[in-house]
Amino acid sequence: MPLAIESGSRAWGFSSPDSDYDCRFVFVRRAVDHVTPWTSRDVIELSLEGDLDANGWDLRKALQLLLKGNAVIVEWLRSPVIYCGQAWFRDDFLEFARQAASREAIGRHYLHLGERQRRVYFGDGTSVAQKKIFYALRPAAALRWLRMHPTEAVAPMHFPTLMAECEPPSDLRAEVVDLMDRKAVTRELGVAPLSRVVAGFIDSEFELARGVFEGGGVGASEQMILRAEQFYRGVVERLERESGTIDPFRPA
């Protein structure tokens, strides 16, 4: 398990006093586990214990989803809260992700994620769960960041950093600071009215993004698929060496 991080509000920077610990991890199977005609499960889901929610993906799954434009693994790699892991793995994987991630696909991911939160949870805006406001606000800020950084595809995960780098209007900054201050002292299910400033920012960024990211997009190139395979093999081989395995294809 070369990487385990916090993926929820504690890493985003807007946790509540009773927020869960959302631990997510990447695991890599031994070389010998690949020499079989049977497909191994690519997800590990642990039972919820208290305020700890933990599950992880096989590196193979993480790479496949990355090449399809899923932003989840990109965010894991940028989490500011690392529970355990190996620095070289995170650094190398993040470098590969920067090259492999499709701006268009990542943009569509954030747009669809944010629009769903807006559509399902905002209602008339008089009483909205605070965390749902952030669940739409964060994708909107990520879309703005992508628009302002036309050569980048990997936005900051940490929300205060994301907001600072996307240079929002001053009235929005004040509203966001107030929201974060309130959420920091309110239980996870606390509610708040949706301000016009926040709603306007969210709707504006989604509207702008529709014109940029709603196209069908292009899948990963053959060259990038080959590079993903090379990266995967390199990780498996290095972990085998570091574990002291002499014959990686001999069962334990």
Where are the model-predicted features located?
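Helical scaffold of the NTase/Pol beta-like nucleotidyltransferase catalytic core
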Residues: 1-5
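Short loop/turn segments at secondary-structure transitions that flank enzyme active sites
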Residues: 29-32, 69-72, 116, 142-143
